[in-house]
């Protein structure tokens, strides 16, 4: 059954992966519309909002102040090239009872009432989109850039006072997963490092081949988790492609693996270093 949801993607960077993220999401959850803000028409079956190359501030401004103009369904499902639906059976119509839902933030200094959540793969209601355009919500990139922090932390009290409903931590975890380390089955995910746990071999390989920045820490963690999960061919492919862009990639990867092993207290990660 098609949901009264508009998939929204804003990207002028990872065109092929962005298109695939939309396709994968639609295969898990049929949605009424797709709206793409991009410099290319990467999804002809949707509505294309032509934009120039976007800065991070441009992205945040669109997400906070412009979505209400382009979303005509009850909810918007924000998708990114590394944030998408994954496990169809984990969809729950209860998600639609809330105005904002995304993966919980892992930061220890956030109290429980400020854990929801990540905007990279998130569900947002019309109520929220219309409140965000209010002059009471001011985008101040010199103080705070990430648009999801405006929703989940900075303006949360004001939004709640105007009727915005946030889900429990448990329901947010069922909706999406971002936290590293530690895999939890959920409807969707955000972050390249989660690809090894959520995408099949075909989609994972395409992700690895089209990934724009193969030497970032997130991408390194992705390669490590392919190896950790016994998907050595994909791990080695990720390493091989990254080495073409950065000759010292293996040394960087070993440092990342050592750091991850310490932070997660995972001795298996140390064993992976020997296989690189």
Task: Mark where each language-model region is.
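Generic structural signal for small/hydrophobic residues in well-ordered secondary structure
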Residues: 34, 81-82, 125
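Catalytic core and acceptor-binding pocket of nucleotide-sugar-dependent glycosyltransferases
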Residues: 116-230
């Amino acid at each position: 059954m098609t949901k009264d949801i508009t998939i929204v993607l804003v990207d002028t960077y990872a065109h092929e992966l962005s298109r695939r993220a939309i396709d994968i999401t639609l295969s898990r959850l049929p949605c009424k519309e797709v709206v793409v803000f991009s410099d290319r028409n990467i999804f002809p079956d949707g509505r294309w909002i032509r934009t120039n190359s976007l800065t991070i501030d441009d992205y945040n401004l669109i997400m906070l102040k412009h979505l209400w103009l382009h979303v005509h369904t009850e909810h918007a499902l924000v998708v990114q090239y590394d944030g998408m639906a994954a496990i169809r059976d984990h969809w729950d119509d209860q998600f639609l009872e809330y105005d904002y839902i995304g993966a919980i933030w892992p930061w220890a200094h956030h109290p429980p009432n400020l854990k929801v959540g990540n905007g990279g793969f998130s569900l947002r209601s019309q109520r929220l989109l219309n409140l965000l355009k209010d002059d009471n919500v001011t985008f101040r990139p010199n103080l705070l850039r990430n648009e999801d922090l405006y929703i989940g932390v900075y303006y949360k009290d004001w939004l709640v006072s105007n009727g915005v409903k946030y889900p429990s931590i448990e329901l947010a975890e069922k909706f999406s997963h971002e936290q590293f380390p530690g895999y939890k089955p959920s409807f969707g995910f955000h972050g390249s490092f989660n690809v090894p746990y959520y995408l099949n071999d075909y989609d994972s390989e395409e992700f690895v081949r089209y990934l724009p920045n193969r030497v970032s820490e997130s991408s390194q963690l992705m390669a490590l988790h392919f190896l950790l999960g016994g998907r050595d061919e994909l791990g080695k492919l990720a390493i091989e492609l990254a080495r073409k862009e950065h000759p010292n990639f293996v040394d960087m990867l070993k440092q990342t693996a050592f750091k991850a092993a310490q932070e997660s207290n995972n001795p298996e990660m140390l064993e992976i270093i020997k296989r690189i």
